[in-house]
């Protein structure tokens, strides 16, 4: 049936999320571990998985073979092999340190007898004696001179068929490959000044880091890999590699989008969070041997620090949630040491730190999205506290430690003595650390966690470093600061939208086709089908459903169900959570309703008031005992679905309120019926009550005792066609006993037959119910 949407919302209405905990932290500091989820609950807590998102990686990944580069003159970087790959004979490269070393490398083709060849070296024409006896290998010859006017002499040779040679500057030396491939090896020959030695290459070359010397040796002896495996297909200028390192701006304001009035600003900030715990130690009256309470308290802390050369004034508020209560009792005598209650934070606890500073990022923190943070961990270690007894040695509680790890960030408001500040609430999960805490001269020892007795360990503060990022919608005029009080306009705008939407919803009632409504009321509408027809929200069904469930949890229907089942933990644990229809056989709700009915009938003198209160509970019983008959909730859900599809003003913001409000206000004048053989009992929320025979519709006296017993054992039915309508129908048209029973049980097929036959009495009744679906 269509009321499945309400059942699904109820089954998920007990899910708790982080925003609930954030809203309740100010009023509920201690969290009880006991959870009573109710018969419709699927889980106690929603899965929450916080992450820091993508982090920039500063790791430098160097290619093994960097190049090829175009022929050029450069100051070769230290600890890099310059692998030269000439394509023809002649001068390959030359270099100098401009003082006492000039060196040159030439390439000689195979089968060259001892001969004189002319080369241009250091700007001069030079005659050099070269030769190459090999018929297959090319020969690299290294020449060196020690003075500007000196003569080049042969220093080393490398024979290879691959036409590859390499040298490197390292430790004020020049390293070079010599010998013959495939057994060529590196060696050094020169002592030079690395800073002032330039190299001029007449051929394409590659750069290989010194850490990859083994790979360079492999290239020299075996040749380069195929060209498509190298980094640059087309040789580039070496200057393209010499890009200056630019330090990223850690704290920056980036304009994401901008219009004439508004702009989106992304604020990236480094942050230093300093906080401290506060505690309260209360001593009991009497002889002075007992303490009543040691507890955590919220603590405000203000400080300044330097961020990117700017002094920042920050304000933090530290509070805890989910504390664990411990106690120690040394005996029953008045002089026995005892602590009635002392708080300890452990793995199941959370620490909240609200942070605000006077930077630009917090000036207009009203409309915020894409909030993220990345923070370091911090260890909080407990100190010692001596319990001063009137006589005897003083017990000392000492030790205890926890590690705080970032678990998320949300928006919050800090309330100081003077102002309220829109701030960031950083949520930390805890892990216990060494050492454990103990109370000396007692048996209490080896307990892990951080007790409230001295959580700061006499330190001025705890400090956490990190960074956060957020995108805020601010006015284009930077001189205008959005007042914090203006944040209430968000709700005011929502109320205005809801008002307009209510008017539209109420006006749509007359556009609903009665026959189609019955068909829709018999469909099992789930949350997806309920929302999928709304424009621009198909992609957002998941997030919208979450918001609707959160709002529905506070509706009067959800609260009534919660009250009805507050003492049903055993029944709740036996309910199959995979199907809402499995709730149809609960016995305890019936007993509870019966007990409530009995109490009402005995305690109240006004029968009309009795019946009105009973009828309200009968709706809850009908809701927990789903049948195949049509109910008021089926009709209200069908009307809601129809109006949602027709509405032009529905939105994700207004949807939660509309869904919850429809469950409370649609069809306020309801009547419920219990059929006992040939007798029907009918009661209304407005206080009306009838008892009549089902075959003649003749009214009979209302038997309270009989009705009270039937409430426990008989199913409750929605009186879609109430007693007055049935009697009018029978008097004017005449109906068979079978039709009467089907109308009494709100059979949708029979109802549709009467509507399709244009029966004015039935049609007017359904139209009256539709008109009651108002907000």
UniProtKB/Swiss-Prot annotation:
A motif (YGL motif) lies at residues 448-450. GO terms for cellular component: host cell endoplasmic reticulum-Golgi intermediate compartment; host cell plasma membrane; host cell rough endoplasmic reticulum; host cytoskeleton; membrane; viral outer capsid. This is Outer capsid protein VP4. This strain probably does not use sialic acid to attach to the host cell. The record marks 231-232, 241-242, 247-248 as: Cleavage. Pfam families: Rota_VP4_MID (PF17477), VP4_haemagglut (PF00426), VP4_helical (PF17478). One of its GO terms (biological process) is permeabilization of host organelle membrane involved in viral entry into host cell. Disulfide bonds join 318-380. Belongs to the rotavirus VP4 family. Residues 65-224 are annotated as: Spike head. Residues 389-409 are annotated as: Hydrophobic. Residues 510-775 are annotated as: Spike foot. Keywords: Capsid protein, Coiled coil, Disulfide bond, Hemagglutinin, Host cell membrane, Host cytoplasm, Host cytoskeleton, Host endoplasmic reticulum, Host membrane, Host-virus interaction, Membrane, Outer capsid protein, Viral attachment to host cell, Viral penetration into host cytoplasm, Viral penetration via permeabilization of host membrane, Virion, Virus entry into host cell. InterPro entries: ConA-like_dom_sf (IPR013320), Rota_A_VP4 (IPR042546), Rota_VP4_MID (IPR035330), Rota_VP4_MID_sf (IPR038017), VP4_concanavalin-like (IPR000416), VP4_helical (IPR035329). Residues 248-479 are annotated as: Spike body and stalk (antigen domain). Residues 484-511 form a coiled coil. A motif (DGE motif) lies at residues 308-310.
